[in-house]
A protein has these predicted regions:
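Conserved donor NDP-sugar-binding/catalytic core segment of glycosyltransferases
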Residues: 1-24
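Short, well-ordered alpha-helical scaffold segment located
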Residues: 59-60, 95
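Terminal low-complexity segments of carbohydrate-biosynthetic enzymes
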Residues: 116-246
């Protein structure tokens, strides 16, 4: 365990039920694809956010005042706070096995997602109808992050679409005073990194889906470079099986 921050461990869900096993394979594949794509886009928030699979240093936990009181997504928001103050390490050396289960306890999360995927594969057992993020969406994110980095150095014009999506997130409020409040580009970059956090990254992607709509997860994985695809399916045998039948 590091002296501060958190470690997020790789995980996989386990189920003896063949339908749930197929559904969770797609869900885990989607989440791994999301994290890998964030990393490729050079996001500072490229880590899984499943609470059962991370450990937090006690001092860091106290610093961020523990778990936020929310009906759902507590793990996501806790790690988002930690990422702004400490380092989050993603470890793939140890994989934690979790029993897959259905749940209506919260409106979003693993349980509700599995139930939605079950509805999809009951109509389409191949799993091809399960949609995930368009790969072009993350290239768009990478461009946005580069332009934000350029803005930290000096005021500049954003791409029209990128600028409009950032403005929908309230970018103008921080942009209007950034260069007058912070003299160094490093300070400005740090401030922008904290503003464009995990939540705003996710909201940015959702807003940009009007330009880059979702597409089949299996179809996307199939055309990924082999190394990228293997990093997602190597510990997900059921997903590998679904891909081979695609």
């Amino acid at each position: 365990m590091p002296k501060s921050g958190a470690i997020v461990y790789a995980h996989r869900h386990i189920s003896k039920d063949p339908l749930i096993s197929k559904a969770i394979a797609l869900y885990d594949g989607h989440m791994s694809y999301y994290v890998n794509s964030l990393k490729a886009a050079n996001s500072n928030y490229a880590y899984p956010t499943l609470g059962s699979t991370f450990a937090i240093h006690a001092e860091t936990y106290a610093q961020v005042r523990g778990y936020p009181k929310r009906n759902a997504g507590e793990d996501f928001h806790l790690l988002n706070k930690i990422a702004k103050t400490s380092r989050i390490q993603y470890s793939t050396e140890t994989t934690i096995g979790l029993e897959a289960r259905l749940s209506n306890r919260v409106p979003i999360g693993t349980g509700p997602s599995i139930k939605k995927i079950l509805d999809i594969i009951e109509k389409d057992p191949s799993g091809q109808s399960y949609l995930s993020y368009n790969p072009l969406l993350f290239k768009f994110l990478a461009r946005a992050l580069k332009e934000i980095c350029s803005f930290a150095r000096a005021p500049c014009q954003f791409d029209e679409i990128i600028g409009s999506k950032l403005d929908e997130l309230g970018f103008q409020k921080i942009a209007s005073t950034l260069h007058s409040h912070y003299r160094s580009s490093d300070q400005r970059q740090e401030n922008l990194d904290q503003w464009f956090d995990a939540l705003k990254t996710l909201r940015f992607l959702h807003k940009a889906e009007s330009h880059y709509p979702k597409q089949s997860l299996l179809g996307t994985l199939r055309v990924l470079p082999r190394k990228e695809r293997e990093s997602i399916v190597s510990k997900n045998p059921k997903l590998s099986e679904l891909l081979s039948n695609f």
